[in-house]
């Protein structure tokens, strides 16, 4: 099991390695393992959700490497928002189809941009987590 300080160290080391100026903090109320908040330029994480996600997505990686995979995906959101100025008003005021289309585009971009930074030894696992995450989300939506 990884604790807050373990995850914070992985985040700090990774951000330093890539000279990324992104804040980070833990948030025990977060309902997902990690997220990026564009308005505050902050990566937030919930260590309990991170550990729960690790147990759901079973791949042959250390817990530390799994956190790196999650982190690079979240950094992908940061890179997407830096490179593409999405009209966020669509998420608030758009119709259902527009909202889903934009969310899907942002999600795809996040995975793609995160993939550009992830170290070579983690690429196959990154792609596997992407595939399993998509299946997990699809399954969650069909089980409602």
Segments the model singles out, each with a brief description of its role:
Residues 1-40, 121:
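A metal-dependent hydrolase signature that marks the N-terminal structural subdomain at the beginning
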Residues 5, 73, 108-112:
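A structural signal for well-ordered alpha-helical segments within the folded catalytic domains
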Residues 81-112:
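Post-HEXXH active-site segment of zinc metalloproteases
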Residues 64-91:
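Catalytic Zn2+-binding segment of zinc metalloproteases
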Residues 50, 70-72, 97:
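The feature represents the first ordered module of a protein
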Residues 23-65, 81-82:
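Active-site scaffold of zinc-dependent metalloenzymes
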């Amino acid at each position: 099991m990884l604790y807050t300080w373990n995850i914070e160290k992985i985040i700090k080391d990774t951000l330093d390695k890539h000279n990324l100026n992104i804040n980070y903090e833990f948030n025990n109320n977060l309902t997902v393992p990690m997220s990026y908040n564009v308005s505050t330029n902050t990566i937030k994480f919930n260590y309990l959700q991170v550990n729960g996600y690790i147990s759901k997505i079973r791949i042959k990686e250390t817990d530390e490497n799994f956190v790196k995979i999650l982190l690079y995906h979240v950094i992908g959101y940061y890179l997407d928002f830096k490179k593409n100025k999405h009209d966020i008003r669509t998420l608030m005021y758009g119709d259902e189809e527009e909202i889903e289309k934009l969310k899907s585009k942002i999600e795809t971009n996040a995975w793609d941009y995160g993939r550009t930074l992830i170290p070579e030894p983690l690429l196959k696992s990154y792609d596997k987590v992407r595939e399993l995450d998509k299946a997990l989300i699809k399954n969650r939506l069909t089980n409602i």
